[in-house]
Design a protein with these regions (language model features):
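Extended, charge-rich alpha-helical scaffold/interaction domains
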Residues: 2, 12-16, 179
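Structural detector for internal amphipathic alpha-helices that build alpha-solenoid repeat scaffolds
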Residues: 18-32, 53-68, 88-101, 123-141, ...
Length: 199
């Protein structure tokens, strides 16, 4: 499997996965992962050469394939979330870290994340963060008070975003992107937003 992964990944671009490579990634969701594949996925999930969306396709397997939790990835997730600048992607590194971390270890990570939520109002970040796979998942699974507080902060800050930029998409429990409005409606809202703000 690793040879196939490496070969077809070499056929991918920085922003687009080759169809054959995508098929291999799909197989990995139900594949018993070994150390070699874990290392491969970790490397690709943090590659600065590729777009966030490409990194996320590899991270999703680590988060959803339960055999990945047979390996100690605590330091990988911690290092990754510290380096990650994109808030929505950081959210999912935190999700991985939470599996290994104690309540006390996760607290400072979430406090800093909460502060970042109060500074950042990129609507794309919030759609991912507030999806059922994001903060709501963490708050329900671990039931820590500070996770619930962070979720409330995210909801409050989301309301500060222009309504024309909210509600375009979400993510389900399988970390799949779900469009909430049609392309026509998205284009209409975008035009209204540009006119409203004279951009």
């Amino acid at each position: 499997m690793i040879e196939k992964l490496e070969y077809w990944f070499s056929k991918c671009s920085d922003c687009l996965l080759h169809p054959e490579y995508t098929k291999l990634l799909d197989e990995l969701y139900n594949y018993e992962l070994n150390q070699e594949i874990i290392d491969f996925l970790c490397d690709k999930a943090t590659s600065k050469k590729h777009w966030c969306e490409i990194r996320f396709e590899h991270l999703k397997i680590l988060l959803l394939n339960e055999t990945s939790f047979n390996y100690d990835l605590k330091q990988f997730y911690f290092d990754s979330l510290k380096r990650c600048r994109r808030l929505w992607l950081k959210m999912f590194y935190i999700r991985g870290y939470a599996f290994y971390a104690t309540e006390d270890e996760l607290l400072p990570v979430m406090k800093k994340f909460q502060q970042q939520l109060e500074k950042n109002h990129d609507y794309i970040d919030y759609e991912y963060i507030l999806s059922e796979a994001g903060l709501p998942y963490l708050a329900e699974k671990y039931n820590y008070t500070y996770l619930k507080e962070t979720l409330e902060t995210a909801k409050k800050e989301y309301q500060k975003i222009d309504p024309l930029l909210r509600g375009y998409f979400t993510m389900n429990e399988k970390l799949e992107h779900i469009n909430l409005i049609s392309n026509e409606e998205a284009l209409k809202r975008s035009k209204e937003f540009l006119e409203k703000h004279k951009i």
